Amino acid sequence: MDRGSFSPEELTEFVNLMQVYEGAMYEISTKLEILDSEFQVRFSHDPIHHMERRLKSVNSILGKLKRKTLPVTVSSIKDNLFDVAGIRVICNYRDDVYSVSNYLSAQNDISVLRVKDYIKNPKQNGYRSLHVIYAVPVFLSSGAHYTPVEVQFRTIAMDYWASLEHALRYKTDLPDAKLAEPTRLRCISYAVFCLKK
């Protein structure tokens, strides 16, 4: 099969798969909204500042398959890509990040597939966030489909830093000297980390 696109048969299967990923994303999102609401009512505390949801675009999915030198098939997406559906949970404080993540992880109808804690172990460029991949059941007429959703938990300050770092890295009109500031970015990241203890 051509590695650049889906066959006509797989295109229909791909559209159906994306509907399942969207359902999984909304399932996790609803669980998070319920947890946030409970915290507001019971504890007068709003741990989630806001959430952002997204499904990877077709081009992003195809690009990731190519970078990983994987075949462009629906099976390859199901077996190898765990971030097609994603939610970013922006919390007020670092303690909120872990509390919300732990309460969500404890729910008995979802499974934790993978955890990468870039808060305790930041990336070399200073990036901090807690990434958890969950498998959540999506109930369709054909039955339950356990589907992965990547949830990135971070504080407002960590989110601001990640946005700034992303803009600096991918902004094309910056001189090379501006792009080569990893030490400065790590220092900013550490300062942001200390702000929201």
Place the predicted regions along the sequence by residue:
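Surface-exposed, low-hydrophobicity interaction/linker segments
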Residues: 24-29, 33-70
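Generic alpha-helical secondary structure
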Residues: 17, 21, 25, 58, ...
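Long beta-strand-rich cores associated with HINT superfamily self-processing modules
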Residues: 78, 91-181
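Short, flexible, solvent-exposed loop/turn segments with mixed acidic/basic and small polar residues
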Residues: 40, 73-82
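Terminal, regulation- and interaction-focused segments at domain boundaries
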Residues: 86-90
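Surface-exposed peri-terminal alpha-helical interaction modules
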Residues: 68, 84, 94-97
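An acidic, glycine-/histidine-flanked metal-binding catalytic module
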Residues: 1-25, 29-38, 150-181
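Positively charged, low-complexity/disordered segments
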Residues: 182-197
